[in-house]
Amino acid sequence: MTLKYTEDHEWLKIDGDTATTEGVVVTVGITHHAQDALGDVVFVDLPEVGALFAQKEVAGVVESVKAAADVYMPVGGEITEVNEALRADPALANSDPLGAGWFFKVKLSDASQLAALMDEIGYTKFSA
């Protein structure tokens, strides 16, 4: 498992081989930093399964007691699954942002887009 991060405070979990885009699916959520800045999450708007998005396109919204924020696609691709548990209990984004609080899964359209994302060390420096 490999984690990558965006400047918009989303994370991607990469399972498997990214040498080919065929069948590569990544899980996407918001970072601990993002959920901490938002405060208590009260609503999430998730994309539809089967929807196609370009990299950096808005794919969802997360609302908290403090603010609303867009969730951007860290990579282009097709939504293969959304986290229905998160829709039912948005607080999972706060209590377990890197685990049970994931937002959606995406089948990559271009694995080369992963190269522009930050690793954990880079993201830690960026968000400090």
Residue positions per predicted region:
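Acidic, low-complexity mobile loops and tails
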Residues: M1-V58, A91, S95-A128
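Short, conserved catalytic or interaction motifs in soluble domains
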Residues: S64-A67, E84
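A short beta-strand motif that forms part of the nucleic acid-binding face
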Residues: H32, K66, V75
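Histidine- and aromatic-rich ligand-binding microenvironments
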Residues: D70-P74, K107
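Short, charge-rich, low-complexity interaction segments located
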Residues: I79-S95
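Composition-driven detection of intrinsically disordered, low-complexity segments
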Residues: D45, A68-V71
